[in-house]
Swiss-Prot record:
ATP binds at R114, K155, S160, S161, G162, K163, G164, Q165, E195, G196, R197, I198, E203. It is an enzyme of class 6 (ligase). Keywords: ATP-binding, Ligase, Magnesium, Metal-binding, Nucleotide-binding, Purine biosynthesis. Gene3D superfamilies: 3.40.50.20, ATP-grasp fold, A domain, ATP-grasp fold, B domain. Involved in the de novo purine biosynthesis. Catalyzes the transfer of formate to 5-phospho-ribosyl-glycinamide (GAR), producing 5-phospho-ribosyl-N-formylglycinamide (FGAR). Formate is provided by PurU via hydrolysis of 10-formyl-tetrahydrofolate. GO terms for cellular component: cytosol. PROSITE patterns: ATP_GRASP. This is Formate-dependent phosphoribosylglycinamide formyltransferase. N(1)-(5-phospho-beta-D-ribosyl)glycinamide binds at E21, L22, E81, D291, K360, R367, R368. GO terms for biological process: 'de novo' IMP biosynthetic process. It comes from Methylococcus capsulatus (strain ATCC 33009 / NCIMB 11132 / Bath). The keyword Metal-binding applies.
Amino acid sequence: MRIGTPNSPSAVRVMLLGSGELGKEVAISLQRYGVEVIAVDRYAGAPAQQVAHRSHVVDMTDPGAIHRLVEFERPHFVVPEIEAIATDALVEIERAGLAEVVPNARAVQLTMNREGIRRLAAEKLGLPTSPYAFADSCAALAEAAAKIGFPCFVKPVMSSSGKGQSLLESPSDVQAAWDHARQGGRVGASRVIVEGRIDFDFEITLLTVRAPVSGGDAGIAFCEPVGHRQQAGDYVESWQPQSLNPKARERAEAIARTVVDALGGRGLFGVELFVRGDEVWFSEVSPRPHDTGMVTMVSQAQNEFELHVRAILGLPVDSSLRRPGASAVIYGGVAAEGIAFEGLERALAVPESEVRLFGKPEAHPRRRMGVALAAADTVEEARRRAVLAASRVRPVKIPA
């Protein structure tokens, strides 16, 4: 791999579609190798835009806007960081040879749609999943929920971070769940997936790297499993490693390898799985760094962002664990623009702790504005430290 100089004819150019906190870390990792970074988002001042060489504000659900921007910037790689993207434009860009889409346009298109990835995993690949059905009206949702059985979960086929998700306890919940899903869905979607509830012991994210190896073939590397705790479909803390018994570990890696190889391309994938004893079920997969994987910034030899970048650039990867670690989310707490944070000196007094503030220009009470990270000799101590550090960071609304 030859890498030139940013802002020169020799530069390797990467365009990030989506410039949130995960994209910011990807941008920083890219810049360590002298890659020219172009950050794109729907609003100005997004986290990755603050560290990129250039930035653009566009409607990423507009195929024409995406196509025109790629033609203007001529990146070598287009790296999606979010789901709310006009994936048809990525297919056209890839087909025309304008840029390499990471991991590839088909993978991005399938994984941004819960119906696409569920049908691939369950019906084509034969992977174990929860029972499921799809619905595109309130009446169809009622029928699907009755078929799957109560309690069950309802999710828009296109959404992220828990948006639009509901737990249905009885038929009386259907209308509210349908309305909530329509409000939380993306790209004008009004279709939902109904999932049966699995009685699992815990959830994991198995960060899986698909990267070129000698001879040009793609090799697979696994990080240690990441455990996480969610509220309302969004993660609030994660830790690594999550202990699995040998049989469950073998099954988890087999499922992850199968789905990642089926998607193809190169990069890091966040494969979400349910685990109960020896049993493992596929849940979802993201073809990019995963929010629960932010813990790897203190736990691994190379964090998930570095692994993603190395896979993209064809560089050697090392997914080994160095030390148990944990992360805990820091929320906005208030609804305001340009908030401040207090208590960092107390947070960083926690042993082996770090804090990342994302720099998002606008806060909401439940918006993720930062994360506390901690390492320790044990996962339990790392979790305690991360939660303590996060609790000491206080968002403050600045008077106008």
